[in-house]
């Protein structure tokens, strides 16, 4: 067993050694399931306590209290495992956590008393927004979290107490599924599913992050974003399918208690019906992609259908936190200057059309209309347009149907307000979709710095930008769900 631990440690070191600042699509070949340390028995209920070792393939575990991984320890979960989390239990990660599901044998982390529902979804009637089990909370001593091919269902129960001493942003009462705060660590979430959250799916205060090829449904009750990295976090959010979010699908912000710029490549995502459940002031600035508070982002090749707002580059209320990263060049940054384009929009009413290029509702914006977008908003608004100005987008309603394989567009009135899950719909593109072949593969590169690439202890592959807009590519690459 010690030999297995040594081998695993060596693999972990190899994973970090494979990091680089270059670009391109790094892919690793799948390897057989591994075991770290001793096997964890599934006989009886696992009480709150410290755990390390391996949950074995295909077994079902029931958990009644917080699973804590101590600093220096590793918990590995093999393919096909189901973990039934009761009593609002969490994973408290001070060491390393590795979940290695596969496409044919995914892992499931769930609240066993809750069941998924299809059709119209509303807060107060759908338990997806209430939080069943808690989340995965990672402290500053957690160096590596790898989550692959895993269903995370009904998470987000409120933290009952502060799980560790934090210098970042976690506090009792938080309701995230994923939380990470080690600026030197790596967090990998790939090829997985998230169903139901009451608040943000993920909150990062530092770290090297790869969020890729996931499907996210019913996220945020009356507030909350999908993926929400804060200051000093860097990485990629790409090839994700995000439907039915309360606020934004993806957001970046150089704020919080972690110093440094937040920098992300945000590309080839599909956003559908996002931004309608946040009715507060922040609801007037939500919908698909939000870049704010001096964060830097590369936002390309995204397909945005029936969302409350298009890609939004925020200024700040009353001149505070004025956004400079799109006008200030910095050669030392991973992203030298914020840039965006080649994004595809479809809208079903005038209110959406009036915010394809967001206006200064709630706070000033500095989003420039782009000629490479579909529709061509630079041509539509004209050379005299000043960012933030109100305009009439009514003539854009119903144009550029992306031609999903199976989804009603034009949508029935109000359908975007309550259809918050995939159900039996298929968001792949038909062969004659106007979104095929309209993306860019050369205008930008993904971030690779600090992201390990390894079949077990890192990313399975940083997928390069795709030529088709959205997360599903006509050549079969991209999101595999």
Tell where the protein language model's regions lie, with residue ranges.
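Extracellular beta-rich repeat passengers
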Residues: 23-59, 63-70, 74-75, 88-95, ...
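Sec-dependent signal peptide hydrophobic core
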Residues: 5-12
